[in-house]
Regions:
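Long, low-complexity, charged/polar intrinsically disordered regions in eukaryotic proteins
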Residues: 3-53
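Short amphipathic alpha-helical interaction segments
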Residues: 86-102
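Short helix-coil-helix linker/hinge
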Residues: 58-65
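Ferredoxin-like iron-sulfur electron-transfer modules
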Residues: 88, 119-121, 272-279, 283, ...
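Short, amphipathic alpha-helical interaction segments positioned at domain boundaries
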Residues: 114-156
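Catalytic cores of enzyme domains
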Residues: 155-312
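Short acidic, hydrophobic short linear motifs in intrinsically disordered regions
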Residues: 74-86
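A short, conserved structural fragment
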Residues: 101-112, 335-336
Length: 343
């Protein structure tokens, strides 16, 4: 697979608005959120040409950046807690937090004993890079967000992919199979099954746009897929994508199954998010190998653990006629065709 995005000239990824003054709060926030090890350790300086800067600048005021800097990354805080740490007026602060959520800088959920709404500053990927691309209003006004998503799905992983253990360790995505293609006597663990997750989040689903497909279109790459409705948000994330302009709409379990069937008919890959342990996800994606950044990154760096399944491809040699169809269709490159032999 030739991932064209990797061959773009460096000028494609510089600050699209060099005429604007550099904003210190944005630099600080970009450094706090980024997963890029050289920047975290101080070996590389974050500048206005860094995607962490020019990806945040269009969607975040200096005041909002200072609010986010007090939150910490992936540390949920209720509105009352935010009032305490910022000292801001509650109504004004709530207005800012809701705007930050609409723009995709923040997400929110109700995952606490009191079931009280809490705001979260997410990672770039998975996180704000996807959310900004899902929001058509933001993406139309700031098409550079498409390139921002591409950069942040690759740059942080360039140095660490060889160290990713089986299962991904919370990095990348986790492939789940089309259940009807798996022998039901197989000792598959339940988290591998779409049905497990649909039952776990019963009644809380929202179909939303694919951020990878939308991102690619901003720089004229990808495929001809309609980006709408391929990402199935579950749980509190379903409310988030519906309420914050991310193109989400609530669907039934039957409608979700119809989307998965349509994805299977198109040869797409079911993937679940992989950052919150084995018993929590926030979405089931239906990924096209031609545009999916998670699949791209795992194959580009030869790190299949990043998009690993609990299943292993095996060939029944006596039945194989070396037609090559399985090689053509497998998005993870799990089988190869040699001299009339499959491995």
């Amino acid at each position: 697979i030739r991932w064209k995005g990797q061959f773009m000239g460096k000028e494609e990824f510089k600050n699209p608005h060099p005429e604007l003054p550099v904003r210190e709060p944005i630099l600080k926030l970009g450094k706090m959120i980024t997963d890029r090890v050289p920047i975290k350790l101080g070996f590389e300086k974050l500048t206005a040409d860094s995607p962490e800067y020019w990806g945040l600048a269009p969607i975040c005021t200096d005041e909002q950046a200072n609010i986010a800097l007090k939150m910490g990354v992936r540390k949920p805080k209720t509105l009352k807690q935010m009032v305490q740490i910022t000292g801001m007026d509650e109504k004004e602060l709530e207005k800012q937090l809701e705007q930050m959520s609409f723009n995709g800088l923040l997400e929110y959920n109700w995952e606490n004993p009191q079931h009280e709404k809490q705001y979260v500053l997410p990672m770039f990927v998975p996180g704000s890079a996807e959310f900004t691309n899902m929001n058509s209003t933001v993406l139309e006004e700031h098409p550079e967000m498409g390139r921002f998503f591409e950069r942040m799905s690759r740059l942080p992983l360039e140095k660490i992919t060889p160290m990713v253990p089986p299962g991904g360790a919370g990095i990348g995505m986790h492939v789940i199979p089309v259940e009807k293609a798996i022998d039901m006597n197989n000792e598959a663990i339940s988290l591998e099954k779409i049905s497990y997750w649909l039952d776990k989040y019963d009644g809380k689903y929202a179909a939303s746009p694919c951020s990878c497909r939308k991102s690619r279109k901003t720089y004229d790459e990808g495929c001809a897929d309609d980006p709408e409705d391929w990402c199935i948000a579950v749980g509190d994330m379903a409310d988030y994508v519906v309420e914050t302009g991310k193109g989400g709409h609530y669907i039934t379990k039957e409608e979700a199954l119809e989307i998965f069937k349509k994805a299977e008919d198109n040869g797409f890959v079911h993937q679940i998010t992989n950052i919150d342990g084995q018993d929590k996800i926030f979405a089931i994606c239906n990924c096209n190998v031609n545009v999916c950044y998670a699949l791209r990154t795992s194959q580009l760096f030869n790190t299949p653990n990043m998009s690993r399944s609990a299943y292993v491809a095996k060939v029944t040699k006596e039945n194989c006629v070396a037609c090559g169809k399985c090689v053509e269709y497998c998005p993870a490159g799990a089988v190869k065709l040699g001299q009339k032999l499959f491995t």
